[in-house]
Amino acid sequence: MEAPTLSQLEGLRYSELQKLAKTAGLKANLKADKLLKVLKAHFYPESKNETLDSDGSSSLTDTDELNSSQEKEEPVSVSFVTHRRGRGRKPIRNQDTPKDEFLTVSAGVGTENMASSIDRTQQQNCTESKKEETTSPIIDNKHRKRSRSEDTSKQNNLESTGKTEKRQKKASNVTSVASTGKIPRLAGRLSKPGSKPSTPNFKKLHEAHFKKMESIDKYMERKQKRLDAVSSSIQEVKMLTKKSNLLKSVEKTPVSDIKKPVKSRLSLLSPLPRTTGASPSRTPMSQRRSCRSSTASKSILVDRSGFKPSVFSSSKMNVRFSEATKDNEHKRSLIKTPARKSSSFLAVTPESEPRRILPSVRKTELLPAPEKADKPDVNITLNTTTQPSPATGMSACKAITPFKFTAQNTETPNTKKKGKFDLQASLSRQLGYQPHKGKLKPWGESKENKPDPNSNVSVLKNNYKQPHLQTREDRRNQHVQNRKNKRDQALGTRRGVPVK
């Protein structure tokens, strides 16, 4: 391949230069100027040296100009070292060193700097007078560099000597305390050259901890005492409850042949209604006596047990407030329902026969007698053992039970047999409700809130997860229905029949 001339190389385009570089085996992905230089250097190596010489001279002149400009700008600055401001740690000044040395050193440095600045000014003047000579600035630069390196080396030597002196003084005067009151840095380590952090004796530490701890025997004794205390308190409570139960059983001793009912089993029949008037059996004097006797018989131990509730569950509580308040007397259905557990109920024991409470007797149903006319309705409790015979009468029945038997003996539900149903009598009896008057509604239209047939409420209710989407078939059916309705309406209007 023939090498192109310099004029030809300069006249070529960028793409042609790239092709040429590729053929020569050079890097073609460069800028046009650099590529041209590379090609020239490759084909004509003599021109390369010339260009380098010219570049060197130009760079020298550039550096000289730069230096001269810097000297013009910074004639005032004494030192050429840029100090870091407050970033690193400040060097520890030894206060024993005299200030005179520091002053002499600084003065020496200052004089040197001043001398160098004077030299520079003289050199500047020389360069202005002799601009044509190229060798003079190179020599000046060399001199400057040497002077700078000498200054820096002197400063470094001074600093290093100062540091070594400081260390020696610290090692000798470890005991002497500084005037400021602070221990100098690393003084402690210098005083103890062979000291190392000693590991603690863990065996001794563990033994000390174990000695502090409580022994297992002592712990077991303490635990046993605590358990005994708890169990004794529980036993005391049990004993108290037993004693109270015994005292209650003593209080319930029978006065006569009729045994008082124990509260173990309660009858499921409704309790007796409380009479407003004072009963003849319970006079004020007798009540006082009973209170005294009950307080006298009660033991001190019973009071210790505290509050004892009569009802142990909310499901068995007496919720019939109408009996006490008398404000719901019209609600007679409440009395018919079976009673719940209450303190006012009569209990039944296995020894005594089960008592029965008679229903309230109407005046009309009783046998007509002039004595009974002004007597109120009474619920009567009968016992088979104490039923008075008609011969003896009222004299045989004494006020043994808390409820005194005042009325005459009537038929109980067991003894009275049910008769046949009399239709005429039931029809003649007055109705307990108001019968409906007027026309009845038709059976089909019994629903008050009839849903609209066109509404989608029922569909939405059924398919709330997957709503019903209107399809083409639905629309087709709707159109068919609309046509049918229109046809019916047209026929109706033609025949004179009103169609909805």
From Swiss-Prot:
Source species, please? Xenopus tropicalis
Taxonomy, top ranks, is:
Eukaryota, Metazoa, Chordata, Craniata, Vertebrata
Q: Where is the composition biased (Basic residues)?
A: 82-92
**Where does it primarily localize?**
cytoplasm
Family in the record: Belongs to the NUSAP family.
Q: Which UniProt keyword terms apply here?
A: Cell cycle, Cell division, Cytoplasm, Cytoskeleton, DNA-binding, Meiosis, Microtubule, Mitosis, Nucleus
Q: Where is the composition biased (Basic and acidic residues)?
A: 323-332, 442-451
> What name appears for this protein in its UniProt entry?
Nucleolar and spindle-associated protein 1
Tell me a GO biological process for this protein.
Answer: meiotic cell cycle
Describe its function: Microtubule-associated protein with the capacity to bundle and stabilize microtubules. May associate with chromosomes and promote the organization of meiotic or mitotic spindle microtubules around them.
One matching Pfam family:
NUSAP
How does it associate, per the subunit comment? Answer: Interacts with DNA, microtubules, ipo7, kpna2 and kpnb1. Microtubule stabilization is inhibited by ipo7 and kpna2, while microtubule bundling is inhibited by kpnb1. Active GTP-bound ran causes dissociation of ipo7 and kpnb1.
Q: Does the keyword Aminoacyl-tRNA synthetase apply?
A: no
Chain intervals for the UniProt region annotation (Disordered): 48-204, 241-299, 319-353, 365-500
